[in-house]
């Protein structure tokens, strides 16, 4: 798109119709709605990139610019025009938008409104700083094409592509990225290929949004920058040469990296015109959260045609706490391993691009604590990179630098390696010096098995430790002259979990070339936290040779034996300059006990790894570094390098023997105690390296805490190998703070427990009491509760069905029915069930008469419970009613006595109710007991007060012990033929409408009978003659249960099944009696 188009676009933005027509053309296909698609294409898409099918670097740029508020401006010539976007989008409309979807002018206008003067000015600046679009043809990124990312500023989905938050969409970005050397590793943008140090990032103030990716490309000394705001996911796709990566690649960053030498980043020795896509899968374990990318600055590599120049990070003057500095958020790294405020300055190689020493790159982990750390200029370093670790840990001594991933780097002699997302950004010296080891060669990764293994198929590839291990990207040579190459190990848990947690890569050993002036500074820094944290096996001595390093050693380094633990790139030399390591340099083996010597056998290493580690942990006092120096002789170095370049101790002292040449004295390799993990190699064979910086007591404590934390976070789940191992691994979980509890404390705890237990018991008892009270209330109810009514209805229904069956059976086979009925009645009596009797009032009468005597006999046995005269027995009724023999019957009126009886029936369950109750009860009882007989009388005139079948069940208890009872029953029977009905009604709730009247009549008759008995001079113990009868029916009077039964029965009367209550009662009584 030319400037005219840009101005045209600006004109159109104000006119919705014109814009719509311009964007969609007469076809008005909403699918071609590039702005809408770019900004709002898929509200549900997490991808930052436009759909690969229609995502062109140009369109992507436009979407990004629109979203970023850096929309195309007059000043920014865009390589692609809206017309191109329209064609592209029409040809492949974004999936989320259907053609029939109405075009939302408001959204488009709002989106276009994001283009502000500030963004226009910024674009103009970029345009001015970037070469004309003609460079685009040269595969140099066009400024406009520099934005290969399409991103909606706040829209979760872009280009209708739905991406898992962590997953990276491999969207091929337009061919415009042809030879761009931008590399993305492990969710981080790596600064590569910036040949123009003069490039400065725009002020952080210009950058809006917490997460930004800035692409800084310098082509022909015209760096371009693109800022992407709010990169929600780690989906960053960098496209190398013109080939587009398959859009459907899932689960990884698609990185096309083509360097002049080929994909050196990925270790491709051949420089292919087409960048090779590399997919770096994201491991969910690498991300503690979705990958918020904060201000990632990507520096574009040189054009393939340009000479390969040292790639240096172009640091912007350090702006403390500002994101304008290179801010890289450790997406993949678990920050707990990183230390806060670790600063390390990269030394640019002497030939390195001009970087003002004042310019430092801040890699700020924008997580909880962003402490501005003053970048420390390393001696002669062009700039320093300051990493603020989320740990918030105090800064380590300046001489010592911890990469958040626990690499310890000395600011002075070492190019600072940044662990970002577990990958180290490394500055590359402009040229590899013989003394320098190409980072590719040197990159070593500690395998979880404690073996160095080449985790990545390509040497250039960064080794990503899923844990917090820091990895050097071998693709770039990061060692500057005199700067040691640092090898990073996998996370401490890989080390066997014994390594201190903090140092995922504490295993890194640094060689400080004594020859380089820097080396002295380096000796000063110790890998201390890292090494100390790491078990020996975890440490890899980083081998770096000073620029003066002997070339002969370089081959040895490169020749690192495959057996060597560096599985990592064993110093693979693809595109590597032999990195001669001067023999004079000694590998600093900060490996724990094991000497720096690496056993060729990974297994051995693994075996001893834990032991060495333990030893390291156990060691608190630094081992004389001189040992290391002694142990590692120049002569030995070649062997170490050849066998195990890292000079990594196998992790156990035993390993040295297996190592052979690498068997440099284990002691020496352990040279430093974990606390003094940094072991420095003498610059010269005869020289003794400078003493490692002594750690303070606070540092020791901090290290121990970090190790304990690391063990806790990544515990070693292997079996305990020895008592010491057990103690070492478990002790950190049993560190107690404070004093032992005193007796007072124990008493206090006991008291608290007692209080709680007492309260619990009280609550339990209260609940129990409440339950019992409810039961009592239910028993005292005159009218049955709803539950009982339902139960009675069900029983009544069953009884009716049973009665109908019995009637049919009686008609069909009377004799057989009688025989069965008698047997069943006996069974019912024995068993708490008299349903048939109840069902059949008539039949039940007979049987109930028999039952009643039995029940009465039982009652008589039980009468002792009741008053002697009353022989009151208590029978439990399902309603929790206790049926007792009739108590004293008072002469009070039937209705009054009934009321009292019901009222007091519950109250005086175990005592003969007062005469009122008794009197009332007697009628009831009589109706139940004597009337029961009467009721039964229907079938048998006055048999023993064969209480209704119900009664037998409920009252079955009451038996007339005395002849009076019989006479009373007879009288009752005679007097109240309806008593049966009454009983039936009362007891069973016959459901007849008459029950009340019948009950009243029955009660009257019962009273009369009782009075007659009294008058007859029957001397019942009870005050009333009826009392005798009552005594015979002892269960009646005292039994509130009877009253309850009566209550129940009364409702039952209305219900109309007399037998139901009696069945329940009889069953319960039978059980109780049994």
Swiss-Prot record:
Residue numbers of Phosphoserine PTMs: 621, 976
Biased composition (Polar residues): 544-576, 591-603, 620-629, 660-680
Domain of life: Eukaryota
Region annotated Disordered, chain positions: 542-603, 620-689, 834-874, 887-952
GO CC term, one of those recorded: chromatin
Biased composition (Basic and acidic residues): 889-904, 913-925, 934-948
Record text on subunit structure and interactions: Component of the multiprotein chromatin-remodeling complexes SWI/SNF: SWI/SNF-A (BAF), SWI/SNF-B (PBAF) and related complexes. The canonical complex contains a catalytic subunit (either SMARCA4/BRG1/BAF190A or SMARCA2/BRM/BAF190B) and at least SMARCE1, ACTL6A/BAF53, SMARCC1/BAF155, SMARCC2/BAF170, and SMARCB1/SNF5/BAF47. Other subunits specific to each of the complexes may also be present permitting several possible combinations developmentally and tissue specific.
PANTHER family according to UniProt: BRD4-INTERACTING CHROMATIN-REMODELING COMPLEX-ASSOCIATED PROTEIN-LIKE (PTHR15572:SF2), GLIOMA TUMOR SUPPRESSOR CANDIDATE REGION GENE 1 (PTHR15572)
Function: Component of SWI/SNF chromatin remodeling subcomplex GBAF that carries out key enzymatic activities, changing chromatin structure by altering DNA-histone contacts within a nucleosome in an ATP-dependent manner.
Protein's recorded name: BRD4-interacting chromatin-remodeling complex-associated protein-like
Classification of source organism: Eukaryota, Metazoa, Chordata, Craniata, Vertebrata
């Amino acid at each position: 798109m030319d400037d005219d188009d840009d101005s045209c676009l600006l004109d159109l933005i104000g006119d919705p119709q014109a814009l719509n027509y311009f964007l969609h053309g007469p076809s008005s296909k909403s699918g071609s709605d590039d702005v809408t698609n770019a900004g709002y294409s898929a509200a549900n898409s997490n991808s930052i990139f436009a759909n690969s099918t229609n995502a062109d670097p140009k369109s992507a740029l436009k979407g990004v610019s629109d979203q970023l508020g850096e929309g195309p401006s007059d000043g920014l010539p865009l390589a692609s025009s809206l017309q191109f976007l329209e064609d592209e989008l029409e040809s492949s409309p974004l999936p989320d938008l259907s053609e029939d979807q109405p075009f939302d002018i408001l959204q488009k206008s709002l989106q276009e409104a994001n283009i502000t003067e500030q963004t226009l000015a910024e674009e103009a600046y970029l345009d001015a700083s970037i070469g004309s679009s003609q460079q685009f043809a040269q595969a140099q990124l066009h400024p406009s094409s520099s934005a290969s990312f399409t991103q909606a500023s706040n829209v979760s989905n872009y280009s209708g592509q739905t991406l898992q938050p962590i997953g990276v969409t491999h969207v091929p970005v337009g061919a415009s990225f042809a030879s761009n050397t931008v590399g993305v590793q492990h969710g981080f943008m790596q600064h590569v290929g910036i040949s123009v140090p003069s490039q400065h990032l725009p002020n952080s103030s210009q950058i809006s949004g917490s997460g930004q990716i800035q692409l800084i490309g310098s082509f022909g000394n015209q760096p371009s920058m693109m800022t992407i705001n709010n990169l929600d996911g780690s989906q960053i796709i960098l496209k190398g040469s013109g080939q587009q990566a398959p859009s459907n690649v899932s689960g990884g960053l698609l990185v096309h990296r083509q360097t002049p030498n080929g994909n050196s980043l990925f270790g491709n020795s051949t420089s292919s015109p087409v960048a090779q896509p590399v997919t770096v899968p994201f491991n969910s374990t690498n991300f503690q959260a979705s990958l918020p990318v904060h201000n990632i600055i990507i520096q574009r590599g040189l054009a393939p045609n340009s000479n390969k120049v040292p790639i240096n990070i172009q640091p912007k003057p350090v702006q403390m706490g500002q994101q304008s500095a290179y801010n890289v958020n450790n997406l993949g790294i678990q920050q707990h391993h990183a230390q806060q405020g670790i600063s390390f300055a990269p030394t640019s190689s002497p030939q390195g691009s001009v970087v003002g020493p004042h310019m430092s790159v801040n890699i700020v982990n924008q997580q909880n604590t962003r402490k501005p750390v003053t970048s420390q200029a390393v001696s002669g370093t062009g700039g320093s990179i300051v990493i603020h670790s989320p740990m918030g840990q105090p800064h380590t001594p300046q001489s010592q630098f911890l990469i958040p991933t626990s690499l310890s780097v000395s600011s002075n002699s070492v190019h600072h390696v940044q662990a970002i997302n577990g990958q180290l950004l490394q500055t590359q010296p402009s040229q590899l010096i013989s003394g320098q080891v190409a980072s590719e060669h040197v990159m070593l990764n500690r395998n979880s098995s404690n073996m160095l293994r080449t985790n990545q198929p390509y040497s250039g590839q960064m080794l990503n430790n899923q844990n917090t291990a820091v990895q050097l990207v071998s693709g770039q040579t990061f060692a500057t002259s005199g700067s040691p190459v640092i090898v990073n190990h996998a996370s401490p848990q890989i080390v066997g979990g014994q390594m201190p947690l903090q140092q995922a890569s504490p295993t890194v050993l640094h060689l400080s070339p004594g020859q380089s002036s820097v080396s002295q500074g380096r000796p000063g820094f110790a890998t201390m936290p890292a090494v100390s944290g790491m078990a020996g096996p975890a440490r890899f001595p980083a081998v770096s040779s000073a620029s003066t390093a002997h070339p002969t050693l370089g081959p040895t380094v490169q020749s690192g034996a495959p057996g060597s633990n560096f599985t990592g790139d064993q110093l693979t030399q693809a595109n590597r300059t032999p990195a001669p390591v001067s023999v004079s340099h000694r590998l600093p083996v900060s490996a724990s006990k094991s000497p720096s010597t690496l056993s060729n056998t990974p297994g051995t290493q693994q075996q001893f790894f834990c032991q060495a580690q333990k030893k390291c942990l156990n060691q608190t006092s630094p081992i004389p570094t001189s040992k290391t120096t002694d142990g590692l002789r120049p002569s030995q170095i070649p062997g170490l390098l050849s066998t195990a370049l890292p000079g990594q101790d196998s992790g156990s002292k035993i390993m040295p023997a297996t190592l052979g040449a690498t068997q440099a004295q284990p002691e020496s390799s352990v040279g430093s105690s974990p606390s003094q993990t940094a072991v420095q190699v003498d610059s010269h064979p005869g020289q003794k390296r400078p003493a490692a910086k002594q750690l303070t007591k606070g540092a020791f404590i901090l290290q121990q805490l970090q190790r304990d934390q690391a063990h806790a976070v990544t515990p070693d789940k292997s079996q305990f190998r020895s008592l010491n191992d057990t103690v070492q691994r478990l002790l950190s979980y049993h560190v107690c703070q404070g004093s032992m509890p005193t007796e007072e404390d124990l008493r206090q705890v006991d008291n608290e427990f007692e209080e709680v237990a007492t309260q619990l018991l009280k609550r339990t008892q209260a609940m129990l009491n409440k339950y019992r009270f409810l039961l009592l209330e239910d028993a005292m109810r005159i009218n049955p509760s709803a539950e009982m009514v339902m139960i009675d209805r069900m029983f009544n229904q069953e009884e009716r069905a049973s009665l109908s069956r019995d009637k049919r059976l009686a008609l069909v086979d009377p004799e057989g029915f009688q025989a069965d009925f008698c047997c069943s009645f006996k069974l019912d009596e024995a068993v708490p069930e008299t349903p048939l009797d109840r069902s059949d009032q008539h039949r039940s009468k007979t049987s109930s008469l028999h039952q009643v005597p039995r029940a009465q006999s039982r009652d008589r046995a039980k009468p002792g419970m009741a008053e002697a005269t009353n022989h009151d027995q208590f029978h439990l009724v399902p309603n929790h009613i206790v049926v007792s023999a009739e108590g004293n019957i008072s002469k009070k009126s039937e209705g009054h006595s009934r009321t009292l009886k019901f009222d007091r029936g519950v109250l005086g369950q175990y005592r003969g109710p007062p005469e009122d109750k008794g009197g009332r009860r007697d009628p009831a009882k009589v109706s139940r007991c004597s009337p029961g007989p009467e009721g039964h009388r229907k079938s048998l005139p006055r048999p023993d007060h064969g209480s209704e079948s119900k009664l037998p069940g409920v009252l079955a208890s009451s038996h007339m012990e005395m002849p009076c009872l019989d006479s009373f029953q007879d009288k009752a029977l005679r007097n109240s033929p309806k008593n049966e009905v009454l009983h039936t009604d009362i007891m069973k709730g016959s459901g007849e409408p008459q029950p009340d009247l019948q009950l009243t009549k029955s009660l009257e008759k019962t009273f009369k009978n009782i009075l007659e008995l009294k008058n007859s001079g029957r001397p019942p113990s009870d005050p009333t003659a009826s009392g005798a009868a009552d005594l015979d029916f002892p269960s009646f009077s005292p039994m509130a249960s009877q009253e309850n039964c009566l209550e129940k029965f009364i409702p039952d009367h209305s219900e109309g099944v007399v037998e139901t209550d009696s069945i329940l009662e009889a069953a319960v009584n039978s059980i109780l009696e049994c």
